Amino acid sequence: MKKVSFVFLVVALNSVVLGENDPFEEINRTTLKINKTLDAVIATPVATLYQKVTPDFIEVGIYNVISNVDDINISLNNILQGKIKEGLSDIARFTVNSTLGLGGFIDVASKMGLQKHNEDFGQTLGFWGVPHGPYIMLPGLGPSSLRDTVGMIPDAFLSPRILLNHEPTIYSLKFLDLIDTRARYLGLESIVIGDEYLFIKDAYYQNREFDTLDGEVEDDFDNWDDF
């Protein structure tokens, strides 16, 4: 019980520390309210309907297709971080899934032992020591930082979607990506503890640190096993 209490204490303290780099908090809180309204009125109903009418194997397949397209961008960012082996593995994943996996609908590559990675240009900047900068709540998109927001620009140009040269298709894929993502996170609102704004901000930074360090985050609780 003491260990659990300590965990929540650390989360609370982290929120206070992160608040020091939040000069746009007033605007961010307003944006969060707008995002919650948009989510309640549009995103959640559409995602709920999508989840109800879409068979599980189709839903998984759609996720796989979107994930497969992202492997090109992931590969380039791995290479930019000097992780050549991982970058080549991402290219192999894309090739295998695009051919044997029917355009990525079936994740054949994972079954072959080709691990799925998670990289973007924001993480690449972080890898090379660029700090997050101010916390930003983006309208319609959610939590971000100045660094990660800037990173979205090259990520957009590195995505194979722009090669389609057909705006309706590009926007349809993006919309489907957003709805599929929202559907997979339905119900998570119940885990929010305390001030929702601070909770989301802290969770965002913790998640980005985990991603940037490839999961190799120092465990602060190794010395608390006796609690």
Language model region names:
Residues 17-21:
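Boundary at the C-terminal end of the N-terminal hydrophobic targeting segment
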Residues 68, 81-143:
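Mid-length scaffold segments of soluble, non-membrane domains
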Residues 22, 123, 128-227:
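A structured, mid-to-C-terminal "fold-capping" secondary-structure block
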